């Protein structure tokens, strides 16, 4: 049991280190877009983008804490969406449908953003029609369910399974597998990610976590 516990601590440390990495591609592309806006005298949008980038990194760092409030996690997701909507010239819309009673509960930071990133890069990027991303948050008994839904190109069942099993080695951020691993390590096998997708219809990612009151996060 001691060896098993040490392995869990080691894996948690590895996942924290991955989480702390700044995605250089995303940062470069965002700064490039801000520079272009400034050159076009579009200072209003440039200021909004800089503000979103600052908030994104402030929440990402969050004093080195692993857990943040769901409210902050959603602000992190929204900051990412603001940046990408400018970069993608409004090729997609996004909306939040959130049960406000869950906002004060705690969750692992940077849980939602990797799935939004996946939706944009793999689901919406090559679409002809306007893309749509919905983030839905609900209570479900003793748990909280976060849904990231898109109307993108979709995937086969095999591709869904591959995403959940494949480690990310291209330094473009936290992989879906890492998020799933993290949730299972912290909370057990009943928690984590499920992906449902249909080609040319879209993808729905469901993230299941326990309800954690502020102060209880130290128990994990």
Model-inferred region functions:
Residues 191-194, 215-220:
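Compact Cys/His-rich metal-coordination microdomains
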Residues 1-196, 202-208:
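Two-component histidine phosphotransfer core
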């Amino acid at each position: 049991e001691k060896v098993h516990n040490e392995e869990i601590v080691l894996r948690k440390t590895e996942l924290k280190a991955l989480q702390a990495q700044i995605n250089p591609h995303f940062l470069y592309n965002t700064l490039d877009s801000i520079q272009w806006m400034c050159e076009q005298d579009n200072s209003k949008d440039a200021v909004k983008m800089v503000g979103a980038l600052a908030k994104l990194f402030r929440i990402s760092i969050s004093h080195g804490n692993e857990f943040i409030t769901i409210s902050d996690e959603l602000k992190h997701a929204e900051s990412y969406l603001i940046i990408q909507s400018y970069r993608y010239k409004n090729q997609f819309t996004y909306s939040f449908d959130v049960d406000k009673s869950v906002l004060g509960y705690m969750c692992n930071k940077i849980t939602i953003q990797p799935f939004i990133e996946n939706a944009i890069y793999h689901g919406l990027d090559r679409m002809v029609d306007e893309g749509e991303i919905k983030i839905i948050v609900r209570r479900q008994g003793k748990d909280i369910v976060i849904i990231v839904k898109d109307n993108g190109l979709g995937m086969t069942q095999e591709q869904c399974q591959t995403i959940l099993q494949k480690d990310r080695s291209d330094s473009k951020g936290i992989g879906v597998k890492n998020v799933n691993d993290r949730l299972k390590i912290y909370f057990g096998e009943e928690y984590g990610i499920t992906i449902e997708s249909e080609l040319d219809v879209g993808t729905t990612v469901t993230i299941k976590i326990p309800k954690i009151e502020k102060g209880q996060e130290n128990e994990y």
